[in-house]
Amino acid sequence: MATAAYEQLKLHITPEKFYVEACDDGADDVLTIDRVSTEVTLAVKKDVPPSAVTRPIFGILGTIHLVAGNYLIVITKKIKVGEFFSHVIWKATDFDVLSYKKTMLHLTDIQLQDNKTFLAMLNHVLNVDGFYFSTTYDLTHTLQRLSNTSPEFQEMSLLERADQRFVWNGHLLRELSAQPEVHRFALPVLHGFITMHSCSINGKYFDWILISRRSCFRAGVRYYVRGIDSEGHAANFVETEQIVHYNGSKASFVQTRGSIPVFWSQRPNLKYKPLPQISKVANHMDGFQRHFDSQVIIYGKQVIINLINQKGSEKPLEQTFATMVSSLGSGMMRYIAFDFHKECKNMRWDRLSILLDQVAEMQDELSYFLVDSAGQVVANQEGVFRSNCMDCLDRTNVIQSLLARRSLQAQLQRLGVLHVGQKLEEQDEFEKIYKNAWADNANACAKQYAGTGALKTDFTRTGKRTHLGLIMDGWNSMIRYYKNNFSDGFRQDSIDLFLGNYSVDELESHSPLSVPRDWKFLALPIIMVVAFSMCIICLLMAGDTWTETLAYVLFWGVASIGTFFIILYNGKDFVDAPRLVQKEKID
């Protein structure tokens, strides 16, 4: 049993110190943070001055250094998601960012503005839905990983034993990590999605749980973070685990998703779908092998399902992926290319059964994890499906939900919940819960990476494609276009700051936030708007002859259209690009 983190906390604030008091039964510990020296020590309750301003909090997210100095981030609101084998799982819904400094008089005007921007970035990440924690259970590991642990591992604190891929506040907790005596105040927080449901089929009650864990390695937003880095970390990597708990028995099925693991980029440039660029100089095999070496160590066999188009701009990526798998020649990897859009065109989504039939035997070989009510491991999952499309969102989620349902069917039959011959699809009440949960999972993952809800969720929710769903997809696509081009630079900077990819240095001579804009940034849009306005005016206020009117309209019309295409040609100068972490042209 892991050493639990403190659940009941009070924050006492004085001009000199922050005191975080543990209020659990029998606890006397008080975490003390000196607001001047930033020193972290352990005290007892009698050391808290009675003059301190006191408030309840629900956890320490960590500390961060900005231009004005250090800040303490605490969880101020939480909601209960559910209970997980008698462990309560919480969702953090509100936070406070508290400055160590009592005044900002030591800052220049530029520093004040930069500090304000950095705080806005921090709050932007904190306002993204999907931060989860438990004070008694390790959410970062799958059931199977937790079953293969040593007694020493079991005695570690939650922070020490957590899978660092999924601890989103790992950078913020670095000061507390260095001092084992304060680890019970350090709360590892997961980012992703968790839902829990008590369900009934044939009068038999069971708990059904869905957990998606987003990796904090190579984290970022849709168009600015693609492919892999030099260490083999894939963009938008998410581990999704589906769990069943029935009569003391526990079963789980794990899948992963992640960007195509070669060096490629797709930077926004005002076009609806920027052209993907595959690096011509990077050592693709080195990064590719690093990625799959780690995946095989963690998960076992890899069945890769590549859902991207096999023609057009996506074709070179599909060919590169297939070539890499073939060149590596690993017996632990199987590669399946399934052109989702081609196979399911004209709303023929029933054709997804072709893919399910193709991988059915492989899925049976991979199996799932199962522990009986006596705690004995009955079955191990021997590998995972690693699915991807371009974003690893919409198409990927549809396929993952279908694979998970097939595994769940087998698990519930083995546990005796489903009778022989019964189909999960026929259990209307459970099907509604199942489909909505997977659609909610899709939306959460999409909002965290692309900035909007997922596309194609009408199929996930209802089992069929609808015209209303197509309209909603169009609306979400428009919002994605705007965000990807005009706000994602700020979003990427926010994530880099939060995760520690960028460290603030108040002594920096030049502010990284101050990036001068080229003359084109203001001049060309103004020229286009003026030209378009003049074109409309000439149409409304006709000249003496129609030929004169036509000449004016053509002149201003050509000027506005010409300027529009010049802006499009120079698209990268007009998008909101990241400013904090200098990224290579092709990552």
From Swiss-Prot:
| Gene Ontology molecular functions | phosphatase activity; phosphatidylinositol-3-phosphate phosphatase activity; phosphatidylinositol-4-phosphate phosphatase activity
Q: In UniProt terms, what function does this protein have?
A: Phosphoinositide phosphatase which catalyzes the hydrolysis of phosphatidylinositol 4-phosphate (PtdIns(4)P), phosphatidylinositol 3-phosphate (PtdIns(3)P) and has low activity towards phosphatidylinositol-3,5-bisphosphate (PtdIns(3,5)P2). Shows a very robust PtdIns(4)P phosphatase activity when it binds PtdIns(4)P in a 'cis' configuration in the cellular environment, with much less activity seen when it binds PtdIns(4)P in 'trans' configuration. PtdIns(4)P phosphatase activity (when it binds PtdIns(4)P in 'trans' configuration) is enhanced in the presence of PLEKHA3.
Q: What spans does the record annotate as topological domain Cytoplasmic, numbered to this chain?
A: 1-520, 570-587
| Entry GO terms, CC | AMPA glutamate receptor complex; endoplasmic reticulum membrane; endoplasmic reticulum-plasma membrane contact site; glutamatergic synapse; Golgi apparatus; Golgi membrane
Q: Which UniProt keywords apply?
A: Acetylation, Endoplasmic reticulum, Golgi apparatus, Hydrolase, Lipid metabolism, Membrane, Transmembrane, Transmembrane helix
Topology within the bilayer? Multi-pass membrane protein
* InterPro entries, alphabetized: SAC_dom (IPR002013)
Coarse class of the protein's main subcellular location: endoplasmic reticulum
Write out the topological domains of type Lumenal.
542-548
- The SAC domain covers 122-451
**Modification N6-acetyllysine occurs at:** 456
Enzyme Commission identifier(s): 3.1.3.64
What name does the UniProt record give this protein?
A: Phosphatidylinositol-3-phosphatase SAC1
Q: How does it assemble?
A: Interacts with TMEM39A. Interacts with SEC23A and SEC24A; this interaction is reduced in the absence of TMEM39A. Interacts with PLEKHA3 and VAPA and/or VAPB to form a ternary complex.
Q: Which domain of life is it from?
A: Eukaryota
